[in-house]
């Protein structure tokens, strides 16, 4: 299936695991905020028409980007939860986005998305009536813990997958799923959960294990290590990420450079 899609990035959260005042999506790696890599990875795909970023109402860290790779970047005020921020983003999409159009949702702090994974998700997901998510099969042995910290059992892993992002769904179905979950007091932890509550079955599209979410200092160090290897030409997927920003060059416009403080053009 051809045609363009818009992406939504919920970025109103203020994770506390790092212990600092700066939300994790704005922490720097190689001179750029994590979210710069996230947005650049999305906008690098030719099918992505633009991005809506849901930010906190008092967000003083948002760099004011208006475009990336010449794709428009819009903002809206997010909510107190991820689901509320995604819903706000869905409602803030431009007038030309129709109810049955597919929309991507991607974590702000998941900066290591490969173009090949996004391409495969769009190809498979847009060929399905419901949509699809990137996911990774569980490869570790899973233990069920008891209240005392002991092992109560071993869980079969053969049909278990870890949900990743982006996730791809039709706009009207995701609005309905998130709205109904909120009305029922259900805290959905990803968009697929909201779709599942409607009785729909999204597809699982296997994605790379290194499409990880940065939630701890160790995750940030891992991403910085991968960036360093990429700069030395040692990353196997370097060519896929040639459109990523760096401290010396930016693909953004409408904001000050994270590296130099100069105005982007």
Swiss-Prot record:
Residues 253-265 have a biased composition (Low complexity). Its EC number is 2.7.7.60. Pathway: Isoprenoid biosynthesis; isopentenyl diphosphate biosynthesis via DXP pathway; isopentenyl diphosphate from 1-deoxy-D-xylulose 5-phosphate: step 2/6. Residues 231-265 are annotated as: Disordered. Transmembrane segments: none annotated. The keyword Metal-binding does not apply. Keywords: Isoprene biosynthesis, Nucleotidyltransferase, Transferase. It comes from the Bacteria. It holds the Pfam family IspD. PROSITE patterns: ISPD. Residues 231-241 have a biased composition (Basic and acidic residues). GO terms for molecular function: 2-C-methyl-D-erythritol 4-phosphate cytidylyltransferase activity. GO terms for biological process: isopentenyl diphosphate biosynthetic process, methylerythritol 4-phosphate pathway. The record marks 157, 213 as: Positions MEP for the nucleophilic attack. The record marks 17, 24 as: Transition state stabilizer. It catalyses: 2-C-methyl-D-erythritol 4-phosphate + CTP + H(+) = 4-CDP-2-C-methyl-D-erythritol + diphosphate. Belongs to the IspD/TarI cytidylyltransferase family. IspD subfamily. PANTHER family: 2-C-METHYL-D-ERYTHRITOL 4-PHOSPHATE CYTIDYLYLTRANSFERASE, CHLOROPLASTIC. Catalyzes the formation of 4-diphosphocytidyl-2-C-methyl-D-erythritol from CTP and 2-C-methyl-D-erythritol 4-phosphate (MEP). This is 2-C-methyl-D-erythritol 4-phosphate cytidylyltransferase. The gene is ispD.
